[in-house]
Structure formats: structure tokens, C-alpha cells
Amino acid sequence: MGNGVQPLDPVAIQIGSISVKWYGVIIASAVVIALLLALSEANKRKMDKEIIVDLLIWAIPISIISARIYYVIFEWDFYKNNLGEIVKIWHGGIAIYGALIGAVLTAVIFSRIKKISFWKLADVVAPSLIIAQAIGRWGNFMNQEAHGAETTRAFLEGLHLPEFIINQMYIDGAYYQPTFLYESLWNVLGFIVLLIIRRTKIRSGELFLSYVIWYSFGRFFIEGMRTDSLMWGDFRVSQVLSLLLIVLSIGLIIYRRVKMNPPYYMEDKLGKVAKKK
């Protein structure tokens, strides 16, 4: 690479012709950490830990598939002429919002089958989801993707970033905004916020909805900085969806408080569908 800057090797392990990329290692690590956190939270909420494990067994593959389908739909102009590329997710091209949609649908169906409260289940996994997203963005970093517009080395140095991040943002002869880092840090902060508000007098389901609001708010602004956004006409898909999710989540919080009177978060411990008070 020009300018004497070398990117980090995206391959973590090479055994003969088989290579394991850092992207996969980081995503797998994010899943494991999310599982451990969810199990810990389930224990505090008096929920059977096997429920969390069973949910993830279904949610992980479905989320990966839905994330890929979401991406392919909005990049169909490319994939319609390259059908073989659709299954090659190691080439990149999965969308977090697609994964979130798949995970929520899986949890809704799963909670009905297991006869437990969807909202309680969603609250338990909310902190895990946002920290997993924070970790997962470093997979994008290793692949030199999900970056922002072109910038200068001086600007990156002005952010007091470590040298390895600055060098990794040097792509095809230019430096780029590390939007992956902005989102990762936003999610870490969101994780801390969720841990704080779960100790307040929020209602069942509101921890998850707070996660959706927090993530969507940050994603709306960060998405505007990216150069690889999925587009719907003249609109960035993730920005449109972010606004819709913020409005929907706030609306659900208000509606459920007024019409359903859900139990307080820390009182909903039985793992069964919460009844109205």
C-alpha cells in the first residue's frame, strides 16, 4: 500500500488453504460475550437460563440469514447479476437492522411457544445486544469497511486515535472517517446507560425499547457520515428505519403505560406472560 502504511491482516488463522478471518472471530466473540451477559441477567430476573440458550440457538442463525437478506434486497442491482455472491457472507454485506428484525421476530414466536413474556425476554437480552453490536463493529474495522467520508491524517491524529486505527483507516490511497468507531463507542455508552436505567422505576419492556431508541438515535447521525449506505431512492435506508423505530418505540412506551399498565421491570420476575394490574 502506498504512503508506507500497511493495513492489519484480516486473516486471524491460516491452516493450509483454510483461513479464519478476524471478522468471524470478532463476531463469534461478540456472541459469546452477549450470551454470558444475557445468562447473568436472566439469573438476576429469576428466569430459567435454558430459555436464553434455546432462544439463541434459533435467533443467531435466523438473524444472520435475515441480515443477509436485508442487505441483498437493497443491493439487488448487484446481486441479480451475481447470484452466487448471495451466500458468500464472508465477502461482507450483512445489515444490523436486518439482524435485529430477525431476532425480534424469532423472540416473538419463541415467547409464544414457551408461554413467557416477550417483553421480559427482550429486556433480559437488551444490554447484551448493544454490547455485541459495539464489539461487532470492530469486525468492520478489520475488513476496512463501514467507514465514513474521506478525511486527512491530521484530522484523525487530532482525535488522538491509536496509530493502528489511523493506519487501518488508510484505504486505497486516502484516509477515511472511522464511523465504525463512533458507533462502537456510542453502543458502549448505551450499554452503560441501560445498566443504569434498569435500576430505575421503568416498566417491563421499556429497557428493550430504550435500547432501540438509543441505538437508532445514534445510528441516524452516524449513518449520515457513511459512504456505503444502503439506499432507497434518495434516502438512506438505515436513517429512515431509525426514525421509524424511534417514533414506534416512544409510542409503545406511552401506549403500554396508558392502556396496559405493565409491571415494573424489577417486579416482573416470574417468566410468565405478565398480567395487567
Curated annotation (Swiss-Prot):
Its EC number is 2.5.1.145. It is found in: Cell membrane. GO terms for biological process: lipoprotein biosynthetic process. The keyword Iron does not apply. It is an enzyme of class 2 (transferase). Keywords: Cell membrane, Membrane, Transferase, Transmembrane, Transmembrane helix. A 1,2-diacyl-sn-glycero-3-phospho-(1'-sn-glycerol) binds at residue 137. Catalyzes the transfer of the diacylglyceryl group from phosphatidylglycerol to the sulfhydryl group of the N-terminal cysteine of a prolipoprotein, the first step in the formation of mature lipoproteins. This is Phosphatidylglycerol--prolipoprotein diacylglyceryl transferase. It comes from Listeria innocua serovar 6a (strain ATCC BAA-680 / CLIP 11262). The gene is lgt.
